[in-house]
Amino acid sequence: IQTPTEPEIELFEVDFSKSPSNFTEEDVNSKYAILIDAETGVVISHRSGNAKIYPASMTKVMTILVAVENIKDFNATFEMTYEIIKPLVDADATRAGFKEGEDVKIIDLLYGLILPSGGDCAIALAEYISGSEEEFVKLMNKKCEELGLENTHFSNTSGLHDENNYSTPADMAIIMKYAMENPICREVLSTYKYTTEKTEENPEGIELFSTMFSRMYGNEVEGVDIVAGKTGYTTEAGNCLVSYATKGEKSYICVLADGESKWKSIYDTFAVYEKYIPFDVTTDISVNDEGSDEISEE
């Protein structure tokens, strides 16, 4: 894979001024939710769309974006270490399944980061690029500054709970927007199944499956193609899901946080795309009091 030239993108902002409605409790279980037009940034509907959330593994969308922008050779390899694997096992964190001493291709780390939500891959990419996770996180926060994300801060690459690893639904939508503008990020985030290269430790390679797509058949919402996404979960964050969908020539981003279960997050996603996309958001409709675009500590 060739390193892509970074596309020149004007600063993308989420526009709450035309939001005609807030999600009903009947339609959306998640405590926090937002649906935006991915081209204009206009908010179609939301629930506390600018409130503080813990993004859990949605963090990895920023991780892959920063990683891809800093990788020169996607066919290079990184040796997986005991020091990376052991703390994740102790924390019962998700891993792609690479083994100690295994030489893993960088491209395989990217797929392992997103599809099974591998914390091992997150730290491996950070160490490969920056020498340590701490140094890589500095790049993530620098990227937040570049994108104008004043309400987002990262403290780790995987989304494990930390008081200083936070965002908002609106900011996560912006991060997803930029990730989908990058062809390699888009390809990885859009993949259902991927097999890593064969190694001595994994002679058949590792079959990786998307935690999002494995919960979908693909035809649940007529006329809508959910093309990419990333799940997340911690006890504090609840169930989270950021997704990117198209309907005709239009594209949309939905972010959900603090849902009751992984399945309810999927059902919420279907409901959002099925019931809220048809709204005409070109007219000047004010957000009601519940839809305030002020940052809050909810």
Regions found by a protein language model. Name each.
Residues 3-170, 179-180, 247:
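Active-site-adjacent loops and short helices of periplasmic peptidoglycan-processing enzymes
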